[in-house]
Amino acid sequence: AMETGSFLVNEKSAVLPEVYLIGQEAKTLSEGLGRKIQLRVSIFGPLEHYLHEIGNTPYQDVLEGLAGTIQRFAKNSVLNNKYIETAVVSIDEPSFGFNNIQAPSDVICGVLEKTFDFKGAVRQIHLHSAAGVHDLLSVKNLDVLSFEYAASPKNIDAVSKSMLEGADKQIRVGIARTDIDSILAELYEKGVGKPSVDQLVEPKETIEKRYRVAKQKYGDRMTFTGPDCGLGGWPSQESAQLLLERTVKAVKLAQKN
């Protein structure tokens, strides 16, 4: 779209190839698993794209064009049939709170409201910083605020349960570290130059403790959890899989007890 001078992608072209492929293979995957597939889709948000393409100076038409484009990708990612259901669409804004577009909060909220103007799935925004979260509480169409907690424990200090209740929002908290470069550096300082898969992943007890702390704070407002984001850079699928498995086991153990 940008090659033609527009930041708004044609609706028929706004399809994530991964989602398309999963949709095509949904019947086979569902029958192999013995259950309906619950899909979570993550998409870089309009603010992140704007920072990469334009910078910090706001241009309303460009912001609205990018918001419309991401909305179309999100809408087309909502699948629902007997084999698959898109349970969550998460818009990822990792720079928000660190490197912001110099626009008034009402403009930013308007951009995000346009982005989240779709139905059929829980609508999340994923942030790496809690700075500026107050501005997002008024965003319509947004169901869940998602934060890094495992690698950035101070994030939950900035978000109270009463804030979420007042805005009728839910929260997702990351409870297992995924910042692999820092993990490797810490292990190296301890004399572990070539860590095993098991050494890369935090102990189940550590993950469970984080879950308990977050759940105690947010109660029924904490409707989602899992690892922090960023498994793409992990050294192997085996290590990433172990992290996911250990996180699930930690949560189930905490809920059981």
Q: Model regions: which residues?
A:
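Domain-level signal for soluble alpha/beta catalytic cores
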Residues: A1-N257
